[in-house]
Amino acid sequence: MDKLTDLNYTLNVITLLNSTLHTILEDPGMAYFPYIASVLTVLFTLHKASIPTMKIALRTSKCSYKVIKYCIVTIFNTLLKLAGYKEQITTKDEIEKQMDRVVKEMRRHLEMIDKLTTREIEQVELLKRIYDKLMARATDEIDMTKEINQKNVKTLEEWENGKNPYESKRMTAAM
């Protein structure tokens, strides 16, 4: 008889829970119930996961303040992502790392600019030397007759009897 009573009691508890859930879900004010349940699940998971992790980290780490700060920042960043924000909380260490990276990149760019400037200066000096060599000789001193093959060409005054030897003559042929 006790077993039947326990069974009836269990069935009554189950029906009571079911009816309570149905009335909660039918209420228009509880339209956000799945979202609230999701947030509570995430918070519970973070709570269960972060406490053992922090205990281990605090035992093994020498600097417990940094570990706690890092864990809290990570939890807040997770909550911000869940809320839909794109911004994140950063620590001073992360900002310093980013600044070091930016400074290193700027130094690399400055070295590149210095190398390019040095090369450009060398090229300008080379062009100046080439220009000076080209301008060293005047064009009057250069004998262009060798270049255009006119050494043996005679002018009109140099021809014998003033006649052009290349002019064609009229000839008649005997048949």
From Swiss-Prot:
GO terms for molecular function: channel activity; metal ion binding; toxin activity. It holds the Pfam family Rota_NSP4. Residues 52-175 are cytoplasmic. It comes from Rotavirus A (isolate RVA/Equine/United States/FI-23/1981/G14P4[12]) (RV-A). It is found in: Host rough endoplasmic reticulum membrane; Host membrane, Host caveola; Secreted. Ca(2+) binds at E120, Q123. Belongs to the rotavirus NSP4 family. It is a single-pass type III membrane protein. HAMAP family: ROTA_NSP4. Residues 1-28 are lumenal. Keywords: Activation of host autophagy by virus, Calcium, Enterotoxin, Glycoprotein, Host endoplasmic reticulum, Host membrane, Host-virus interaction, Ion channel, Ion transport, Membrane, Metal-binding, Secreted, Signal-anchor, Toxin, Transmembrane, Transmembrane helix, Transport, Viral ion channel, Virulence. Glycans are attached at N8, N18. The chain crosses the membrane at residues 29-51. One of its GO terms (cellular component) is extracellular region. The N-glycosyl content is primarily Man(9)GlcNAc, with a small amount of Man(8)GlcNAc. The keyword Calcium applies. Plays an essential role in the virus replication cycle by acting as a viroporin. Creates a pore in the host endoplasmic reticulum and as a consequence releases Ca(2+) in the cytoplasm of infected cell. In turn, high levels of cytoplasmic calcium trigger membrane trafficking and transport of viral ER-associated proteins to viroplasms, sites of viral genome replication and immature particle assembly. The secreted form acts as an enterotoxin that causes phospholipase C-dependent elevation of the intracellular calcium concentration in host intestinal mucosa cells. Increased concentration of intracellular calcium disrupts the cytoskeleton and the tight junctions, raising the paracellular permeability. Potentiates chloride ion secretion through a calcium ion-dependent signaling pathway, inducing age-dependent diarrhea. This is Non-structural glycoprotein 4.
